[in-house]
Amino acid sequence: MRYQNMFETLKKQDKMAFIPFVTLGDPNYEWSFEIIKTLIDSGVSALELGFAFSDPVADGVTIQASHLRALKHASMAKNFQLLRALRDYNPHIPIGLLAYANLIFSYGVDGFYAQIKECGVDSVLIADMPLIEKELVIKSAQKHQIKQIFIASPNASVKDLEQVATHSQGYIYTLARSGVTGASHTLKNDASAIIKTLKTFSSTPALLGFGISKKEHITNAKGMGADGVICGSALVKIIEENLNNENAMLEKIKGFIGGMIF
C-alpha cells in the first residue's frame, strides 16, 4: 500500500515521484544511515537501495565504485540491520531494493523475500534477471507480499512491454536509454512511445531512470508521460566527491534534492 498511497498523494498534488538510488553501506554503514535519513528528511517520494555486488554489470563507473566502497565491509546481515533501522525511522516511505540475481539465489530466494519483508521492504528489482526468468521469484514475492519490479527497455518488443506492464507491481522501471547507469547532460531518447505502450496494458506507474541528473530532466520525463524518475549516479557522485567530509556530503545531498524536487 505504501507505493499506492505515495502515487495517489502525488497525483492529487500534480507532482512527479522523485526516487533516489544509493548503495547500502556506501561509504560505510554509519554514514549510509545518515545519508538515507537525509534523503528522507529532504522530502524524496520513496527509496531505491542497492545491495553491493562484485560484478554490477548494469551499472556505470560511478555506481560500480559505490559497490566497491560498500563491499569493503558489506554483509547481508548488516544490510538487513540497516533496512530495519530505516523502516523504524520512517514507517511510511516506500522502500525498494535493487539487487543482482546471484545475491538473492545464493541466499535462497524464499528466505531472502521473507527476510526483506520482515525488514519492512516494499519492492525488489533484480537488475540482471530477464523477464523470461520471472517464475523463479514471483511466487516468493507474492507469498511475502513484496512487489516485484521489472524493467522496460528501449529495445523491448510490444509483447515484452505487455509482459513487463502486466507483471510489474508498485511501478515499472522504464529505461531512458539502453546501456548502463550514469548521469547525462540531456535525455537523448524520447521514452514517450514506450510509456504510452506500457499504459495501454496497465495503470501501474512508469518511472524513468538512467541519466536523470537535472531538474529539466524531470520536466522532460513528465512530458514523456512518466509518473516519476529514479536518480542514482548524480547523487552517488556527491558521495564519491565528499568521502572526507560527512557534513559537507550531507549538506550537498540536501541541496541537490531540494533543487530537484521543489
From Swiss-Prot:
It comes from the Bacteria. Keywords: Amino-acid biosynthesis, Aromatic amino acid biosynthesis, Lyase, Tryptophan biosynthesis. The keyword Phosphoprotein does not apply. Pathway: Amino-acid biosynthesis; L-tryptophan biosynthesis; L-tryptophan from chorismate: step 5/5. It catalyses: (1S,2R)-1-C-(indol-3-yl)glycerol 3-phosphate + L-serine = D-glyceraldehyde 3-phosphate + L-tryptophan + H2O. GO terms for cellular component: cytosol. SUPFAM superfamilies: Ribulose-phoshate binding barrel. Its EC number is 4.2.1.20. The alpha subunit is responsible for the aldol cleavage of indoleglycerol phosphate to indole and glyceraldehyde 3-phosphate. PANTHER family: TRYPTOPHAN SYNTHASE ALPHA CHAIN, CHLOROPLASTIC, TRYPTOPHAN SYNTHASE, ALPHA CHAIN. This is Tryptophan synthase alpha chain. It comes from Helicobacter pylori (strain HPAG1). The lineage of its organism: Bacteria, Pseudomonadati, Campylobacterota, Epsilonproteobacteria, Campylobacterales.
